[in-house]
Amino acid sequence: MEEKLKKAKIIFVVGGPGSGKGTQCEKIVQKYGYTHLSTGDLLRAEVSSGSERGKKLSAIMEKGELVPLDTVLDMLRDAMLAKVDSSNGFLIDGYPREVKQGEEFEQKIGQPTLLLYVDAGAETMTQRLLKRGETSGRVDDNEETIKKRLETYYNATEPVISFYDKRGIVRKVNAEGTVDTVFSEVCTYLDSLK
């Protein structure tokens, strides 16, 4: 099983809040049959399952602390192993957030085939998030919080992008356009992996 993971197509998907990466991931799943794994979703699912690990996570998150890297990696690996036979590849969404996370992922799970960088300007992301905030009811979709989230994102992501850029596996997608325009660019990169 572990060997199969090492051979699997693994795509890190990186993009700021409001860049549209979630939407692009959904479209990739539909067209290519990849499995979309978001560390945030995995954590939330584990917490609501009421498992032993979930209870520990809940306590950590309630204090506003970061979940230990080992725990996140174990959850990712478990989720990937569960799907490795039925999936054409994996989209790892919102991970790695720092270089160390990427290195640990490679040691414990496998090498990324590609890093898809869904890149939209700060202005575009802000407008999209404000618009989403009107309907989503998400507390973190207001202008002040958005500014902070974008800052955090840029500071964390730049070193990750340059780390993988040195290996030549970063594919930058211009996410300013419509969903379909962006997706056709995404497809050119994924089609080249076959």
UniProtKB/Swiss-Prot annotation:
GO cellular component, one term: cytoplasm
Cofactor: Mg(2+)
Binding site for ATP: G18, S19, G20, K21, G22, T23, R132, G177
Region (LID): 131-141
Binding site for AMP: T39, R44, E65, L66, V67, G94, Y95, P96, R97, Q101, R138, R149
Location of the region described as NMP in the Swiss-Prot/TrEMBL record: 38-67
Any one GO molecular-function label of the UniProt entry: nucleoside diphosphate kinase activity
Biological process annotations from GO: ADP biosynthetic process; AMP metabolic process; ATP metabolic process; nucleoside triphosphate biosynthetic process; regulation of G1/S transition of mitotic cell cycle
Catalysis: reaction(s): a ribonucleoside 5'-phosphate + ATP = a ribonucleoside 5'-diphosphate + ADP; AMP + ATP = 2 ADP; dAMP + ATP = dADP + ADP; dATP + AMP = dADP + ADP
Residues recorded with modification N-acetylmethionine: M1
Keywords: Acetylation, ATP-binding, Cytoplasm, Kinase, Nucleotide-binding, Phosphoprotein, Transferase
PANTHER family given in the database record: NUCLEOTIDE KINASE
Function text: Catalyzes the reversible transfer of the terminal phosphate group between ATP and AMP. Also displays broad nucleoside diphosphate kinase activity. Plays an important role in cellular energy homeostasis and in adenine nucleotide metabolism. Also catalyzes at a very low rate the synthesis of thiamine triphosphate (ThTP) from thiamine diphosphate (ThDP) and ADP.
Protein name, entry field: Adenylate kinase isoenzyme 1
Highest classification ranks of the organism: Eukaryota, Metazoa, Chordata, Craniata, Vertebrata
Gene from which the chain derives: Ak1
